[in-house]
Amino acid sequence: MRVCRCEIKCRSSSSCGSLKGETVSAFRSKRKLLLILTTLIIALVLAVYFLRESLPTNVFLWTSSLLTSLKSHMGNSSSAAAVLGVLQTAYEQSQRIAYAIQPQDNQTLISTPLTPASAPAPMLPPTPITSSRNRSEQYVMMIPDQEDVLSSAVEKPQFACDETNSPNYMIYCQGELLHAVMMLNIFKDSKTFVDKPLKRDPEIVAAEFKDQFPGTITSNDREAVREFVNANFNEEGHELEECELVDWQKEPEQLLSIEDPDLRQFALQVNLIWKKLCRTIKKEVVEHPRRHSLIYVPNEFVVPGGRFREFYYWDTYWVIKGLLASGMHQTCKKMILNFHYLVDTIGFIPNGGRVYYLRRSQPPMFIPMIYEYHMATEDDEFLLSMLNSMEKEFSFWKNQRMINVTKNGKSYAVFRYRADTNVPRPESYREDYQTAERVDRQKKRKLWRDIASAAESGWDFSSRWFANRKTMDTIETSDIAPVDLNAIMYWNMKILAHLHGALGNVERRDELNRERSRFVDTFEAVFFDDREGAWFDLNIRTGERDDDAYPSLAVPLFTECYSSLNNHMMVDVLETLQRKGLLQFPGGVPTSLMKGTNQQWDYPNGWAPINHMIIEGLRKSNHPIMQQKAFEIASKWINRNYQVYQKDKKMWEKYDVAKGYVRAAKGGEYENQAGFGWTNGVILDLMVTYSKRVTVIPSERQTPRQPSTSSDAHVVAAAEIADLTLGKLMQRSSLRAISSFLKCHG
């Protein structure tokens, strides 16, 4: 500011330094140029970070030319140089992100130097670049090479698919074409490319790409690569077609039992969405499997929706819960048969229905799916046909995802997520590559493995997996033994034992029950924290429990993973959920309390499966207080879904549950998706479960409601009593803790 005042008041003063002799108008002209440049670069940064799209190359070149010209005009002004330095850094960073550029020691990104020239550079923008490999490469931006992806110096690369499990691996999981398409940012969503079916066999397309692009690929090749993709690939989703659900009913009996008229109508509208989400695989996938990234299954299935065009593993459990509420037993059976087919042909159930998911799974919900179907149908013949597949899936997790940990000097076998890949995920290749730019080369393999492992967890992504609780580059998923995964594996043991017993296989039932009993002791020793009164993830690297508040700590209630002698644990867990602040929000339970991470499995986002497991875990207890709390959370979640549907006429993948105002959620690698399979399943299951009690919030009511009945008054009174009792219970629990402390230290 001092320089500016000096220039205006005393242009001839010696204190004016380097500005002496200049005119006010000349300085104002420079200031205007600086303002224009600042605005342009800010716009570039915003466009790159928020739009996530590549901008026309000439925009960057024009900005570069303006930077060069302005720097030469500014002379020796230190203030201007400092500002220009900041702008230069911001410009280069936005340029790198837009084109996924990794600076090389022997490479300049732009041929025009940014040092003062002997004569002012022209202010006109350069000639726009055209897409041709034969044009002059005056302005070249190199895409980063694949050295870190392909190198075996630290650890041999393990790709999402290769010649051992997918004949089209050179297109969809690795290779020059995949790398170029992702680094050139051809598509806004990385998943778009790897979902596209080929028009010809993969070997031919890969060879032709190498012939057409033999040298180093640069930003000049963007349009040529785009044209190559358009010429050799069909549209994503081309290999799937909508199908008819033969057992769909317009007015399922269970949905008609919902007493609240607005919620009943809402349930029937959600029931309609099943028809829009049904998919079957076209014959061309069977005839030419190598031309598709889609994994073939024989029967129709319900997809999540949006960018998720294929089936997904753990989603299907909650889809089946909703289909059962809609009375669609045959569709449930067919979807289970698809997974039976995958276990028989692949050996496990992958994350989803694409070849790039073949090296990771998702939370093991196959056995619970069969249990839910059998409970609804009592189809013993079908159950018998599923036994071998259930045992094989159970063995996969025991053999591939178990690890020994030490706690208090004793060794325990527990489960963890650990994907069998250590390179960028094909469906998020560009994002993973850029994340790894911030870490040492020696750590990139583990970083990529832990990113894929977080995707295997279903929580992709959450601060729960980050060492610093903030940024993806500190992810350490494979170093964590998750409390919810281990609780689900306990549930698998319990269900498998029960189903064997139902079929008269007493010996196997007893064997599984003994294993389950031992695992309960392991679970309590490894995960339960007496001071906190809840179960928490174990960090294998540090040997310590992570006591940050995540609703996963309530999953053992859902799977009933606790000793019958320790029922007080359930009340302690409810108290912990309350004390940590997870139950205070108007729309349900958020996936964490970590703010500012911009990850979709963090605050303020709530997800259907997490809310469902918490609600069901509390509801299945024998404690009236916990059952009442389950109803309260269910009412919040149902009303938030209902409110957003009235506003958007859509069901969403996730919801903002923390705000008083109503909206779908944000955050993560991709935009919130509509559909949505498991959201629909959970909402229908909960509305049927609480069909006699749950109501729309009065301010949101669409249909006039009849005057309150005595049963309504009873529910209100019960709620008030439960709240009062909860307060007393928490008081007693606190006194008990103090008493215990005094006994130990008195």
Q: How does the language model describe each region?
A:
Residues V343-M386:
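Aromatic/His-enriched, Gly/Pro-containing loop or helix-boundary segments
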Residues E53-V83:
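Ser/Thr/Pro/Gly-rich low-complexity linker/stalk segments immediately outside membranes or between
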Residues Y312-L342, S552-S564, H612-P624:
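Alpha-helical support elements that line or immediately flank enzyme active sites
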Residues Y373-S385, L496-E511, K620-Q628:
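Inter-helical turn/loop segments and adjacent helix faces that build the functional surface
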Residues P122, D145-E310, K334-G353, K407-I480, ...:
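Extended glycan-interaction surfaces of carbohydrate-active proteins
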Residues M1-K30, N76:
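Short, low-complexity, Lys/Arg-enriched N-terminal segments of secretory-pathway carbohydrate enzymes
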Residues M390-E393, R509-E524, A630, A634-I638:
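Short amphipathic alpha-helical coiled-coil/interface segments
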Residues C16-L61:
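N-terminal signal-anchor transmembrane helix specifying type II single-pass membrane topology
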